[in-house]
From Swiss-Prot:
Binds 2 heme b groups non-covalently. A ubiquinone binds at H201. Heme b b566 binds at H97, H196. The keyword Transmembrane applies. One of its GO terms (biological process) is mitochondrial electron transport, ubiquinol to cytochrome c. Changing S377L: In strain: Isolate 223. Heme b b562 binds at H83, H182. This is Cytochrome b. It comes from Ursus americanus. The gene is MT-CYB.
Amino acid sequence: MTNIRKTHPLAKIINNSLIDLPAPSNISAWWNFGSLLGVCLVLQILTGLFLAMHYTSDTTTAFSSITHICRDVHYGWIIRYMHANGASMFFICLFMHVGRGLYYGSYLLSETWNIGIILLFTVMATAFMGYVLPWGQMSFWGATVITNLLSAIPYIGADLVEWIWGGFSVNKATLTRFFAFHFILPFIILTLAAVHLLFLHETGSNNPSGIPSDSDKIPFHPYYTIKDALGALLLILVLAALVLFSPDLLGDPDNYIPANPLSTPPHIKPEWYFLFAYAILRSIPNKLGGVLALIFSILILAIIPLLHTSKQRGMMFRPLSQCLFWLLAADLLTLTWIGGQPVEHPFIIIGQLASVLYFTILLVLMPIAGIIENNLSKW
């Protein structure tokens, strides 16, 4: 009798994706982050669903409803903090996942990579709108500043901003629509993630050595199911520690002050995972220039495959490129730190230098390093 998991229409899809999937035998822990992102997404959808049952998207009651969730709803505080800190874990996994793709040349799987970039933009949009919902000071002013960036678009900018706001400032209409979008987007992310996996399974996964592994494949189950389960356990352990010991570590104290349009906080800044892009935005004095730099700082990932000059796929055997990669990682940490600092000397110049270095490494130095390494390998 044929095994039901190989014949049943639904079970067959699961079988081909999670059980009998041929996987390279040498993929390291850096390949765990894809499944961890799946765990984060499911966790966010579940905690978000329970929060939505008690949240009210009205400017007069939004802040109070969050207080109500934390004080009166049974285990509401843990659901709220798991959702808020779950977003931070989501972005840590995202950055690791993208970094892995850059390091090992996974961007050469172009369809998977491009869907990944769309996913990154969608997750960033979702997180931004989620940050507006508690209707604290940073929620309100963050929404005002970031949506206002669209006014830099020539001709239609001002009308576009008012259309998004649903009025002449961030108001009740803005909050309601942001809640609606924040609720629907994770399901769009789920669909995009399925397409991401579909394209990945068309070509098969990359591996640390960067050479084809068709001659050396092992079944996904039990080898990588147990490995992913361990990764998920560690992720939940870190998240639990964060939620139970210091839930406000990554948040902003200003968000415990109800939104007040008449009082601007001394330093408006987004959540920590957007600070690198925010620093790039602020490093350019011109508004439109800043917005373009902000968009291009993420969109630059789309042209990375075109800038690949090396004969080798990954950076495993390319010391020059490795140095540049870790310089890029340090540069992003510097930008993240600068994004959280006030706009004054010496932070302005540090931010500008770090921004220039970011684009220089990706657009100029890495392609040159690839060519140099090609020539060195001939010796």
